[in-house]
């Protein structure tokens, strides 16, 4: 039986988001697998499936807003916001900049976050967790509570383990395993 998780992997391969070859990652590490998340999340079916999967994961968590570091989180947070609205359980979307704007409002975080809000951080890939931890720090600094961290892909190169060790509820949709296999998370 083909589960929604397995279908997401099939679509990621079909859109070219999952690639095999020789790649240099943002961390500088070399890899024989690469996930080009925007090819999945900017595809109409991919955006719907990712948004739907993350909404399922967030169900019952009390999350009020979802977002993360630009640019990877932009289509993910938008998809989740749209799907949540369609389900009648709207979640706000927000974006964290690499650094505050140098003009206008000079914001680090775009969106309607307020202190005390329960938020989920999303990203396309977690390798060592740098982007996710920047987003976590930014929202926690304004008084928000991170109750869930969701990535489309966990590369299993330390980031996911560090999130869990630091007390965050981390859920990937897809695992890139050390043996080279790609495995769906059956939780959604």
Question: Where do the language-model regions lie?
Answer:
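PRPP-associated nucleotide enzymes
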Residues: 1-122, 126, 130-188
């Amino acid at each position: 039986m083909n589960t929604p998780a397995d279908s997401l992997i099939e679509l990621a391969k079909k859109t070219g988001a999952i690639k095999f070859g020789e790649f240099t990652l943002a961390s500088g590490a070399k890899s024989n697998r690469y996930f080009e998340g925007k090819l999945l999340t900017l595809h109409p079916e991919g955006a719907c499936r990712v948004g739907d999967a993350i909404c399922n994961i967030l169900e019952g968590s009390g999350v009020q807003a979802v977002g993360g570091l630009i640019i990877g989180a932009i289509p993910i947070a938008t998809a989740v916001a749209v799907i949540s609205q369609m389900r009648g359980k709207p979640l706000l979307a927000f974006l964290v900049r690499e650094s505050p704007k140098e003009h206008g409002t000079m914001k680090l975080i775009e969106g309607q976050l307020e202190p005390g809000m329960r938020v989920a951080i999303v990203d396309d890939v977690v390798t060592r967790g740098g982007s996710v931890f920047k987003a976590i720090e930014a929202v926690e600094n304004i008084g928000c509570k991170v109750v869930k961290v969701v990535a489309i892909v966990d590369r299993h190169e330390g980031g996911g383990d560090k999130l869990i060790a630091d007390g965050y509820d981390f859920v990937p949709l897809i695992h890139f395993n050390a043996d080279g296999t790609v495995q769906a998370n059956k939780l959604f």
